[in-house]
Structure formats: structure tokens, C-alpha cells
Amino acid sequence: MRGKVLALVILFVCAAPPLLSAATPFVVQETYRGLSLGAIGLRPGVKLDIAPLETGKAMARLKEAIDILHRKSPFSIRAIETLQSAGNVVIVYDPHFPKSRFSGLTIAAYFPEYYQAGGSSKQFVTVVGRYGAKWPAAELAAVLVHELVGHGMQRYRGRLEHVRTIDLECEAYLYEERAYQDIGLDKLSTEMIKFRRTLEDNWCKTFRMHTRRSHPSSVALWERLNPDVPGILKVYLDYIEVLRKNGAARKAIDIERREGLRR
């Protein structure tokens, strides 16, 4: 599963999706468990690489994924409720997403500027595309946590401007890892092993190196089938603060922007 969706991981900072407004003609729009759900109808004449799920079925899949989180992942729901206290939490089904130029199967992505409603409240927006609507609900639930909780909480805490992309993704992957634990997916399956390797050996590699150097007693938080995500996140906060203060994060972000990897 994870090998198919790696394309989603940097879209929230580097892509420029079509900007929707509060007047966007959603064919379906409703509030579900405090979340604003909206579906965009397929534009006439548009040809896609796969047949998108019918809007009603796509919305039902989103609700099923949300229900799974409410039943099984109070850790994730508490974070979503934090976002709800600060603004509007929006999940949009857009069958046109992603555009064909993106490689891989992009399931969902967090776009801070995808949808702008009237007023000054923050919008925490995750877009689920035509692939994501067909994804199994349990896996989709964890991807929603990655995008909405992981990247949404980063915006809530003001981290998007001073944390390197690799570290933003590390944090989002940690939230996703915790969701997989809560949902009860088989952590010894081939796909979960691939996910764990991507988490540890790619996105969180430099963070884990920092942990070994500066917090050796915390290495044990990783060394189990189900890593202690809340404990790891406490160490992570120290790590990103070190990078902010010593200027390493700013230098990396400047390079990302010069290379067009970040807005």
C-alpha cells in the first residue's frame, strides 16, 4: 500500500492546486461528526486515467473512514478536535485530483490554500482524490490522519514556515503510525513493514540520528512492534527546536524554495 502512495508526501507544500472559494458548487456538502465534507462533481468532458467513484459512494467511504477513527483512535480524534477548536476542518472529495502529471497513486493530500471560506478562521483542508475514494476505509483513515492531523497540526502550531520538509513528513508519518496501531492493522504484513522502513530509514532518519546522540535513553521508544508515538513526539519537539535555533532548518528551507520544492 505505502509504496503506491509516496507521491502524496510533499504535495502539501509544493503543489499549487486550483483555489476553491466558499462559493464553489459542491454537488454534495454536509457536516459529519463536526467535519465539513464536500464533493466536487466531475467536470463535463473530463477524461481520467481511472473511472472515479460515484459521489455518494465516495462520501460514504469518507464517513466510514471517519467512523473508524472515532471507534478506534481517540489519539487522532483528540488532535482533530484541537483543529476544530481553531477553525473549520474540511475534507473535500475531488475526482480530478491528482492531475496526471503527478507520479504514483496519490490517495490524499493536505493543502492549506486549497479552499478559502469567508471570514478569518483557519481552514484545515484535506483533499481526497479518485484513488483515495476507492481505498479500503481502514487504510484511508490512517492516510487522513497523516494529512489532516499530521500536517493540519503543523499549521495549527505554526510549524510550516520553520521546519524542514523531511521533518514535517517525519511527524506526519508518526501520526499515521499511531493510527495504524489504533486501527489494528497487521504490523507484520509486507505493506506495514514497508511503511515502517519508509518511516524510520527515510523521513525520520535524521531525527533518529539526533535521538541517538542527544536522547539515547529514548531510542528504546522506537524498538518495539508498536513504537511509543506520544513519547517520540516529545523528543521530536526538542529536535525541531534545535534545528530552528541553530539555523539548519532555515538554510534547508531556503534551498527547498530555490529549487521549487516549497512555496
Predicted regions: what is each one?
Residues 127-144:
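Short pre-active-site segment immediately N-terminal to the catalytic Zn-binding motif
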Residues 142-155:
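Active-site recognition of the HExxH zinc-binding catalytic motif
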